Curated annotation (Swiss-Prot):
Coiled coil: none annotated. This is Small ribosomal subunit protein bS6. GO terms for biological process: translation. It comes from Pseudomonas fluorescens (strain Pf0-1). SUPFAM superfamilies: Ribosomal protein S6. The lineage of its organism: Bacteria, Pseudomonadati, Pseudomonadota, Gammaproteobacteria, Pseudomonadales.
Length: 142
């Protein structure tokens, strides 16, 4: 069996169906003896260019180990499913199980956003405590 990285884009109006689609595709691969090494749902994202007058899509990425037969059946499912507007299958040399760069970048963005929001609240509270400590030490000297 070979390793593949599969990314497919689902029409934004069909986003509710993504869970069922992923379940159906993983079942198809596992029934043929394959394995799912990584599954990431990247959610709705802006497309770089419009596809059939659609500007957003729901992205899903799979890293799988499967037979050629299972991959061909999966590609047929993509081809005949109107909800899948694009798909990409890349053959990999080995299984990839770590987090994707896309997901890492998203987490970094959310962490930076949280850090930006925190100092406003934490900084003012720390500043008040240090002022009150210095006021107390001044009073102790008198």
């Amino acid at each position: 069996m070979r390793h593949y990285e599969i990314i497919f884009l689902v029409h934004p109006d069909q986003s509710e169906q993504v869970g069922g689609m992923v379940e159906r595709y993983t079942k198809l691969i596992e029934e043929d003896g394959g394995k799912i090494h990584r599954l990431e749902d990247w959610g709705r994202r802006q497309l770089a260019y419009a596809i059939n007058n659609v500007h957003k899509a729901h992205y899903v990425m799979l890293n799988v180990e499967c037979t050629g037969k299972a991959l061909a059946e999966l590609e047929d499912n993509f081809r005949y499913n109107d909800a899948v507007i694009r798909n990409l299958v890349i053959r990999r040399d080995e299984a990839v199980t770590g987090q994707s760069e896309m997901l890492k970048a998203e987490e970094n963005r959310s962490e930076r956003r949280e850090r930006r929001e925190r100092p406003e609240h934490d900084g003012s509270a720390d500043g008040d405590d240090s002022d009150s400590d210095s006021d107390n030490s001044d009073n102790a000297d008198e």
